[in-house]
């Protein structure tokens, strides 16, 4: 039977529960344990798919087509275990399922209540499909005391009794703020957070204390005394230069040992973390650097492109270079902005990421044109590929009125709504006036690469599988004029109906992909497209 580690947060949000969970999972894996990480999100949205990127950040898509929290990206990158739909649950989805059961009469006339119906649903989710695991780590979103999270806190309290006290450990992440005026670290917020947690019936076994300054031994003893945990289970968590240093820091402070000890597992075998040390060394001691501009719509919140940022870092790791990312608002390239050309001229490569809606689209097209004309390495992802096709249609294929039907009626809809596609041998269909949530082409789909193409060489394969999240696609009826304009359709769906990759053979590095390769990139296994893109940027840096 799997053991469960429940991770809660206190004092403030955004302390890094997700990174802590991912780091702990990685350390347990290095000890040979089989792990899986799950996320409980207390918000009432069914999933984050329809939420604003500025509110939620990135939507992380799994192989099986789930739109999930960005923390699942950290889980997958650190552990290497592909996330699944069953690894993320929201209050919205729980209530949706419960209400559907009530409408069907499944509760046989019983009064449907938070306890036991909601809490039972949460417990079922936590325990589902865990028989082949050693540890299941469950992160509870939000902060202890939030009204929204109370059913989850109650559910994990019950699980300790259901599963047996030796099979559940509670890890609580808090903030130990530094008051500059007094020159002191303050432990009182942590004490109050633990008091709130214990008032709900949960005594934490391990305390992780985020702090900007080293936590003195006397303060650890004080926290241990007032929070009723062993001193060895008070783990300092200082800021790190890179998120890939975090597992090393946590191991040095004894997090994995404290958690195993709380389970009664006293394992003294030294841990070999050479893989993580190698990554840390490459990041700390690069042999060069490149500057890549990301021309996007949501650059005001970098979490909106979290996996993209990490994939570029992974490309830098593969090439032993530091990647400097310049975030550029696409709208600055619309009209005659004298600063626009200057901003692009200083870049070694240009990337246009995914997005939705018309705002900023002309700026993205202008950035594509600059990259094409000035032979700057260009990478278009999802909407970025579509903008590359519109730019090519207008400026190299003679289709001056080319646009996307996403932006309104068009005389030349080079980009159109896809209403049906094939998945696992079956046709999926969507209506133009259907719901927004969960109706896109989501999850992993195969593609066939053109023999001799640049992407076939990069992948070293003719067949690939990548993750998608889109409802618009390059209109196959414009394939011929676009190819006459210099674009090569080097990747297609197996049925030959959906363009997946375009490239320009007359350009040093110009590739557009309809999928999201950043979702599969990992520090120990950088995605080949990002590795090659950064290599192209490095080559460009030596030319300017």
Swiss-Prot record:
Mg(2+) binds at residues 71, 139. ATP binds at residues 14-19, 71. One of its GO terms (biological process) is pyrimidine nucleobase biosynthetic process. GO terms for molecular function: ATP binding; CTP synthase activity; glutaminase activity; identical protein binding; metal ion binding. GO terms for cellular component: cytosol. Pathway: Pyrimidine metabolism; CTP biosynthesis via de novo pathway; CTP from UDP: step 2/2. The keyword ATP-binding applies. UTP binds at residues 13, 186-191, 222. It catalyses: UTP + L-glutamine + ATP + H2O = CTP + L-glutamate + ADP + phosphate + 2 H(+); L-glutamine + H2O = L-glutamate + NH4(+); UTP + NH4(+) + ATP = CTP + ADP + phosphate + 2 H(+). Its EC number is 6.3.4.2. The active site is at residues 382, 516, 518. Pfam families: CTP_synth_N (PF06418), GATase (PF00117). Allosterically activated by GTP, when glutamine is the substrate; GTP has no effect on the reaction when ammonia is the substrate. The allosteric effector GTP functions by stabilizing the protein conformation that binds the tetrahedral intermediate(s) formed during glutamine hydrolysis. Inhibited by the product CTP, via allosteric rather than competitive inhibition. CTP binds at residues 13, 146-148, 186-191, 222. Keywords: ATP-binding, Glutamine amidotransferase, Ligase, Magnesium, Metal-binding, Nucleotide-binding, Pyrimidine biosynthesis. L-glutamine binds at residues 54, 355, 383-386, 406, 471. The keyword Phosphoprotein does not apply. Gene3D superfamilies: 3.40.50.880, P-loop containing nucleotide triphosphate hydrolases. Belongs to the CTP synthase family. CTPSs have evolved a hybrid strategy for distinguishing between UTP and CTP. The overlapping regions of the product feedback inhibitory and substrate sites recognize a common feature in both compounds, the triphosphate moiety. To differentiate isosteric substrate and product pyrimidine rings, an additional pocket far from the expected kinase/ligase catalytic site, specifically recognizes the cytosine and ribose portions of the product inhibitor. Homotetramer. This is CTP synthase.
């Amino acid at each position: 039977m799997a053991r469960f580690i429940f991770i809660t947060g206190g004092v403030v949000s955004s302390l890094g529960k997700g990174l802590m969970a991912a780091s702990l999972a990685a350390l347990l894996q290095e000890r040979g344990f089989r792990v899986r990480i799950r996320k409980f999100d207390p918000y009432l949205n069914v999933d984050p798919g329809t939420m604003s990127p500025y509110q939620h950040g990135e939507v992380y898509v799994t192989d099986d087509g789930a739109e999930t929290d960005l923390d699942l990206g950290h889980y997958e990158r650190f552990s290497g275990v592909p996330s699944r739909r069953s690894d993320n649950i929201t209050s919205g989805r729980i209530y949706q399922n419960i209400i559907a059961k009530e409408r069907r009469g499944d509760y046989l006339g019983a009064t449907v209540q938070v306890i036991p119906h909601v809490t039972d649903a949460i417990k079922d989710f936590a325990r589902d499909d865990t028989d082949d695991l050693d540890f299941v780590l469950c992160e509870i979103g939000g902060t202890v005391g939030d009204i929204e999270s109370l059913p989850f806190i109650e559910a994990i309290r019950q699980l300790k009794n259901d599963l047996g006290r030796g099979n559940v450990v509670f890890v609580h992440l808090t903030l130990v703020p530094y008051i500059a005026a007094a020159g002191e670290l303050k432990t009182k917020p942590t004490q109050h957070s633990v008091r709130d947690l214990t008032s709900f019936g949960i005594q934490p076994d391990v305390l992780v204390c985020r702090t900007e300054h080293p936590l003195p031994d006397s303060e650890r003893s004080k926290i241990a005394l007032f929070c009723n945990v062993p001193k060895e289970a008070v783990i300092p968590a200082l800021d790190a230069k890179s998120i890939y240093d975090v597992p090393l820091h946590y191991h040095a402070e004894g997090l994995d040992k404290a958690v195993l000890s709380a389970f009664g597992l006293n394992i003294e075998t030294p841990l070999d973390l050479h893989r993580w040390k190698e990554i840390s060394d490459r990041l700390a001691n690069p042999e060069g650097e490149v500057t890549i501009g990301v021309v996007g719509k949501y650059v005001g919140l970098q979490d909106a492109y979290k996996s993209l940022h990490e994939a570029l870092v992974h490309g830098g790791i593969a090439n032993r270079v530091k990647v400097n990312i310049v975030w550029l608002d696409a709208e600055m390239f619309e009209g005659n902005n004298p600063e626009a050309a200057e901003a692009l001229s200083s870049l070694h490569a240009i990337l246009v990421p995914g997005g939705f809606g018309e705002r900023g689209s002309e700026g993205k097209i202008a950035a594509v044109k600059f990259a094409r004309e000035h032979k700057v390495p260009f990478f278009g992802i999802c909407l970025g590929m579509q903008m590359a096709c519109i730019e090519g249609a207008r400026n190299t294929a003679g289709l001056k009125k080319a646009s996307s039907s996403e932006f309104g009626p068009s005389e030349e809809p080079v980009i159109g709504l896809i209403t049906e596609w094939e998945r696992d041998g079956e046709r999926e269909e969507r209506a133009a006036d259907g719901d927004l949530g969960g109706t896109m082409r989501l999850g992993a789909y195969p593609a066939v690469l053109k023999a001799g193409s640049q992407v076939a060489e990069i992948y070293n394969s003719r067949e690939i599988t990548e993750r998608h999240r889109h409802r618009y696609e390059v209109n196959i009826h414009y394939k011929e004029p676009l190819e006459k304009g210099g674009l090569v359709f080097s990747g297609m769906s197996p049925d030959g109906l959906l363009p997946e990759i375009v490239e320009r053979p007359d350009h040093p590095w110009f590739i557009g992909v309809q999928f999201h390769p950043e979702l599969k990139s990992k520090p120990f296994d950088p995605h080949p497209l990002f590795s090659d893109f950064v290599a192209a940027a490095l080559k460009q840096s030596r030319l300017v």
